[in-house]
Curated annotation (Swiss-Prot):
Gene: entH
GO biological process, alphabetically ordered: enterobactin biosynthetic process
Protein name: Proofreading thioesterase EntH
Residue positions of the active site: E63 (nucleophile or proton acceptor)
Gene Ontology MF terms: 1,4-dihydroxy-2-naphthoyl-CoA thioesterase activity
Keyword Thylakoid among record annotations: no
Amino acid sequence: MIWKRHLTLDELNATSDNTMVAHLGIVYTRLGDDVLEAEMPVDTRTHQPFGLLHGGASAALAETLGSMAGFMMTRDGQCVVGTELNATHHRPMSEGKVRGVCQPLHLGRQNQSWEIIVFDEQGRRCCTCRLGTAVLG
């Protein structure tokens, strides 16, 4: 297991109370040895004006996962901040749920890189994201 902080899924989900994460309906669903996953509904909260999943909502899911994964790689007195987010959108969605899967690409003392892949309910890739974070403290 790579994580330095040991939180349960319930504890992770409690951090979302009264935030954009909760407003978008993002729920952490799996914490594995080197992976963090979450689901997000594709509905009016996450649609763009033409009824499709908003690219910014996919980016918000990715940054949520990467930032929390980054936080779980810190020690007491440290925090992480996002420095770069890249998203490539592959296919549209209009309803259902998407699942984000976050895994590390690089875990340095001062910076981290995370890959977040967003899948539809059929397991098809909808979006590929990369988040860079800086470790402070």
